[in-house]
């Protein structure tokens, strides 16, 4: 999986532990702690492809709910509130899903 090759296990664990409680997820802090912000745009796009479980070219709301599991099987599901907030922050064109460029822009904002 792309995550293991691009991100450090310790950083993934630290990030997941920090957002273990329901409704505690903050995408900006998560991206920073897990090490995504430090990655190049190309590597962030590889992470996107790993999170795009159905390979549709988009991360839809249902996939977004399980985004933490994409980093580790130990990750929890996002709550509906967290999922909607994450989607609203990333979905700049309002199509209800996150495209690869929207994801990369969100990580590096």
From Swiss-Prot:
<feature type="binding site">
    <location>
        <position position="102"/>
    </location>
    <ligand>
        <name>Ca(2+) 2</name>
    </ligand>
</feature>
<feature type="binding site">
    <location>
        <position position="93"/>
    </location>
    <ligand>
        <name>Ca(2+) 2</name>
    </ligand>
</feature>
<dbReference type="InterPro" id="IPR018247">
    <property type="entry name" value="EF_Hand_1_Ca_BS"/>
</dbReference>
<feature type="domain" description="EF-hand 1">
    <location>
        <begin position="39"/>
        <end position="74"/>
    </location>
</feature>
<keyword id="KW-0677">Repeat</keyword>
<keyword id="KW-0106">Calcium</keyword>
<dbReference type="GO" id="GO:0005509">
    <property type="term" value="F:calcium ion binding"/>
</dbReference>
<protein>
    <recommendedName>
        <fullName>Parvalbumin-7</fullName>
    </recommendedName>
</protein>
<dbReference type="InterPro" id="IPR011992">
    <property type="entry name" value="EF-hand-dom_pair"/>
</dbReference>
<dbReference type="GO" id="GO:0005737">
    <property type="term" value="C:cytoplasm"/>
</dbReference>
<feature type="binding site">
    <location>
        <position position="60"/>
    </location>
    <ligand>
        <name>Ca(2+) 1</name>
    </ligand>
</feature>
<dbReference type="InterPro" id="IPR008080">
    <property type="entry name" value="Parvalbumin"/>
</dbReference>
<dbReference type="InterPro" id="IPR002048">
    <property type="entry name" value="EF_hand_dom"/>
</dbReference>
<feature type="binding site">
    <location>
        <position position="58"/>
    </location>
    <ligand>
        <name>Ca(2+) 1</name>
    </ligand>
</feature>
<comment type="similarity">
    <text>Belongs to the parvalbumin family.</text>
</comment>
<feature type="binding site">
    <location>
        <position position="63"/>
    </location>
    <ligand>
        <name>Ca(2+) 1</name>
    </ligand>
</feature>
<feature type="binding site">
    <location>
        <position position="91"/>
    </location>
    <ligand>
        <name>Ca(2+) 2</name>
    </ligand>
</feature>
<feature type="binding site">
    <location>
        <position position="95"/>
    </location>
    <ligand>
        <name>Ca(2+) 2</name>
    </ligand>
</feature>
<comment type="function">
    <text>In muscle, parvalbumin is thought to be involved in relaxation after contraction. It binds two calcium ions.</text>
</comment>
<feature type="modified residue" description="N-acetylalanine">
    <location>
        <position position="2"/>
    </location>
</feature>
<feature type="binding site">
    <location>
        <position position="97"/>
    </location>
    <ligand>
        <name>Ca(2+) 2</name>
    </ligand>
</feature>
<feature type="binding site">
    <location>
        <position position="56"/>
    </location>
    <ligand>
        <name>Ca(2+) 1</name>
    </ligand>
</feature>
<feature type="binding site">
    <location>
        <position position="52"/>
    </location>
    <ligand>
        <name>Ca(2+) 1</name>
    </ligand>
</feature>
<dbReference type="Pfam" id="PF13499">
    <property type="entry name" value="EF-hand_7"/>
</dbReference>
<keyword id="KW-0479">Metal-binding</keyword>
<feature type="domain" description="EF-hand 2">
    <location>
        <begin position="78"/>
        <end position="109"/>
    </location>
</feature>
<keyword id="KW-0007">Acetylation</keyword>
<keyword id="KW-0514">Muscle protein</keyword>
<feature type="binding site">
    <location>
        <position position="54"/>
    </location>
    <ligand>
        <name>Ca(2+) 1</name>
    </ligand>
</feature>
């Amino acid at each position: 999986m792309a995550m293991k090759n691009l991100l450090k296990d310790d950083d993934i664990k630290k990030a997941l532990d920090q957002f273990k409680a329901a409704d505690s997820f903050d995408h900006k802090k998560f991206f920073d702690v897990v090490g995504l912000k430090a990655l190049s745009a190309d590597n962030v796009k590889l992470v996107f492809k790993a999170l795009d479980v159905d390979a549709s070219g988009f991360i839809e709301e249902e996939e977004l709910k399980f985004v933490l599991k994409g980093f580790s099987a130990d990750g929890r599901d996002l709550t509906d509130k967290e999922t909607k907030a994450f989607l609203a922050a990333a979905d700049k064109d309002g199509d209800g899903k996150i495209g690869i460029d929207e994801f990369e822009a969100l990580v590096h904002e």
